[in-house]
Amino acid sequence: MKKTKIINLFAGPGAGKSTIASGLFHEMKKRHIKCDAPYEFPKELAWNESNKEIKDQLYVIANQHRGIVRSYGIVDYIILDSPLLLSLAYKDNYTSEYPANLYGDSFEMMMLDIHNKYDNINIFLERPDKSHENEGRFHDENTSLQLDRRIKSILEVNDISYTKIKVDEFTIKSILDLVLK
């Protein structure tokens, strides 16, 4: 089986992850690189205003992981605008009650274990000023900035290496240069 590389785009909501993932997918396909960009399951929940489902990060992550499993070993790269480890940042974000209170250390260890079994290229997107859109989201700009900090902290505390890339007109080229070096 082919060892697929996972391109993880990390940042809070509204930083441009989905737009960048789409552009990256387009540019890689133009270069005849075998890649996939699975649909961001949490975005589907946001558009459907599925507040109950988004609180259950085990459900969210299972559906998000299906997108990886579907094309893993078939393509060279999978581009994720909702990396698996984001579940660690979101598990307590919507509620500290049921079902979030079920997900303790064992959930975190499982997510880290799954993440570490993949060949990852981790990118933290540094959002531009005034980039946030509330449409199709559960979070406002302030919460999104807090999530940026929480995500970065999760990566650092768990010794997960990542490359910071500023979101601007050169972002996709910068990611391509990193991925294809």
Positions of PLM-derived features:
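Short loop/turn segments at strand-loop or loop-helix junctions that form parts
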Residues: 40-42, 82-84, 124-128
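Conserved nucleotide-sensing/catalytic segment adjacent to the nucleotide-binding pocket
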Residues: 50-100
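Conserved substrate/cofactor phosphate-moiety recognition/catalytic segment
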Residues: 22-66
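A glycine- and Lys/Arg-enriched "phosphate-lid" helix/loop adjacent to the NTP-binding pocket
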Residues: 95-171
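Hydrophobic anchor at the beta1->P-loop junction of P-loop NTPases
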Residues: 9
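Walker A (P-loop) phosphate-binding loop of P-loop NTPases
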Residues: 14
